[in-house]
Amino acid sequence: MKVVILSNGPGNYSTKRLAEEVRLFGHDVQIVKYKECYASIEKSNPTVKYQGEDLMVDAIIPRIASNMTRYGTAIVRQFEMQGVYTASNSIAITRSRDKLRSMQLLAKAGVGIPKTVFSRNTADIEDLLDQIGGTPVIIKLARGTHGNGVVLAETKKAAKSVLQAFYLHNEDGTNILLQEFIKESAGEDIRAIVVGGRVIASMKRQSL
């Protein structure tokens, strides 16, 4: 089986380890910088090219950076059109990059989450804060990684100031979320790895 790892960081530890494991299972593996891929959309013969050659593969492992989500998932979709197996499909990747969409899906599935509210109207701030139990409150952008765009507002005044600043740069209110502050978490969260609908590993992450 020929496997392609889509990664713009071929030298990254995680990418190299994935390649090592694929080889251990006896498969051929190639690391491809998806930002350098280009595609042809055709009804009968959709293609993906890299360095002038058609990529003919059996499976892909997408490692799509958050700042390349739109282009990266477009390349993944192109492989999906060919019937190529993908470890993470384009829909799952897109959903995971939108915190609001993720929260809605988790809540629908019955998974416990912090109380979360959103609105695009600054006049709703008072009611939003009341709905999640007041301050302190977590305010975050729906799209962001590594803690960027996340603020802990200790008071109502601080929360209003942060929200008003965020609203100035985000006309679409779904880009801004307010969440109840879970004191007991103390900057910790749990990351779970799900394969085939089952959690196969987990880790606790502690903010510095």
Q: Which stretches of residues belong to each language-model region?
A:
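ATP-grasp fold ATP-binding core
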Residues: 106-107, 129-148, 170-185
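Rossmann-like NAD(P)H-binding beta-loop-alpha module
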Residues: 112-134
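Phosphate-binding site of ATP-dependent enzymes
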Residues: 152-208
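Short hydrophobic segments within beta-strands
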Residues: 6-8, 195
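Conserved N-proximal alpha/beta basic substrate-recognition cap immediately N-terminal to
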Residues: 8-115
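Short, hinge-like loop/turn segments at secondary-structure boundaries
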Residues: 47-50, 103-107, 132-134, 155-157, ...
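Extreme N-terminal starter segment of soluble prokaryotic enzymes
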Residues: 1-4
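Structural detector of well-ordered beta-strand residues that form the stable sheet scaffold
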Residues: 86-87, 114, 138, 177-179, ...
